[in-house]
C-alpha cells in the first residue's frame, strides 16, 4: 500500500501516526533551539521544558516506528513501556499528556514550543477520533508497520 493509498483509507490512526512524526521533528528541533537560546538568558524553566520536549521526541520515535524496538538495543522495561502505548486511546492519552506538559511551558514565557504543543494536540485528537469511531489501529507500512519487520528480519 502506497502512502497515498494509506491516506485515502480515512483511518485517523494513519493521520495520527504521520502527525506524530511531525510532532517528533518539531519537539526535537524546537526543544534544541529553545534550549540553546535559553542558556544565554539563563531561563531555567524554558531549559527544563526544552529538555522535556527533546525527551518526548525520542519517546515518540519509538512509539511511532515500531521497527526501532527490534533494531535498537533497549532495555526490556523500556520496550514493555513503549508496547503499552499500542491502542488508539492509549496513544491519544500519551499525546495528550505530552501536549499538556508543553502547553504548560507557556505559563512562564511564550516560545516556539507552542508549535510543538499544537502538533502534539492534533496528534492526540486524531488518535482520539480513531478510537471514538471504532477504527482499529493501522500502522503505516512506510514507518515500519505490519509486514516490514518480517521482510527485514
Swiss-Prot record:
**Listed transmembrane segments:** 12-32, 44-64, 89-109, 112-132
Q: Which GO terms describe its biological process?
A: vesicle-mediated transport
The primary site where this protein sits is Golgi
- Organism superkingdom: Eukaryota
What are the alphabetically sorted keywords of the record?
Glycoprotein, Golgi apparatus, Membrane, Transmembrane, Transmembrane helix
The UniProt entry's GO CC annotations, sorted and at most eight, read: Golgi membrane
- Cell compartment(s), UniProt: Golgi apparatus membrane
Glycosylation annotated at which residues? 11
Q: How does it sit in the membrane?
A: Multi-pass membrane protein
**Coiled-coil residue windows:** none
Pfam families in UniProt: Cg6151-P
UniProt family annotation: Belongs to the TVP18 family.
Q: What does this protein do?
A: Golgi membrane protein involved in vesicular trafficking.
The name this protein carries in UniProt is Golgi apparatus membrane protein TVP18
Organism whose genome encodes this protein: Podospora anserina (strain S / ATCC MYA-4624 / DSM 980 / FGSC 10383) (Pleurage anserina)
- Name of the encoding gene: TVP18
Amino acid at each position: 500500500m502506497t502512502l497515498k493509498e494509506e491516506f485515502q483509507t480515512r483511518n485517523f490512526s494513519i493521520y495520527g501516526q504521520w502527525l506524530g512524526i511531525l510532532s517528533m521533528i518539531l519537539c526535537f528541533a524546537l526543544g534544541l533551539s529553545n534550549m540553546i537560546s535559553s542558556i544565554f538568558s539563563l531561563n531555567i524553566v524554558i531549559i527544563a521544558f526544552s529538555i522535556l520536549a527533546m525527551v518526548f521526541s525520542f519517546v515518540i520515535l519509538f512509539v511511532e516506528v515500531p521497527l526501532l524496538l527490534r533494531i535498537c538495543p533497549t532495555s526490556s522495561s523500556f520496550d514493555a513501556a513503549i508496547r503499552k502505548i499500542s491502542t488508539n486511546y492509549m496513544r491519544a492519552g500519551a499525546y495528550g499528556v505530552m501536549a499538556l506538559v508543553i502547553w504548560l511551558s507557556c505559563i512562564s514565557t511564550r516560545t516556539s514550543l507552542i508549535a510543538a504543543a499544537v502538533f502534539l494536540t492534533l496528534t492526540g485528537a486524531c488518535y482520539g477520533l480513531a478510537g471514538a469511531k471504532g477504527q482499529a489501529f493501522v500502522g503505516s507500512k512506510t514507518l515500519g508497520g505490519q509486514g516490514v519487520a518480517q521482510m527485514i528480519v
